[in-house]
């Protein structure tokens, strides 16, 4: 790991030591982790994510992982799965649909992990590898490990949260729609009761408020 600066990692390799190293870096995070996983979360990463931490870890998936219960098992793991909005009364004006240009990856094909991006020692791991066994052992891939560059970390974090919030909202809409039309109604309240969950210590919304306000 470079003290400050950029290092490179290349594949294919004869073993999974590189993935194990990424997993150790994730496990040593101090304030937050942000991960994109186009083809599911590797078992080595799942071993880290299944153990609770006192900070938030965000995972953005192309499709539902085979171990969704494990990923959601830790209360401070925030997981979003890519999707489009279901049909609704507004579809004549704002119906979402896929382009159909790619049959293997519909939504998310970026590969990066961000560790402690808003701290003094941010780490961005990004490149062409899928954080998978195949991409490590068989594919011709390259990754950059960028340490201590706050500007790069800010850019990657902004793009991650743009995508995460976009798809997390669509996941909530699908979940509401599955429970029936009455449960799907959610009107704005005419008081400040909505903010209570952002001030309940230890909850995801509480920690998210503090983290993005600079209290980390």
Feature map (PLM): residue ranges:
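Beta-propeller domains
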Residues: 2-60, 66-68
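PLD/PLD-like phosphodiesterase catalytic module centered on the HKD motif
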Residues: 43-216
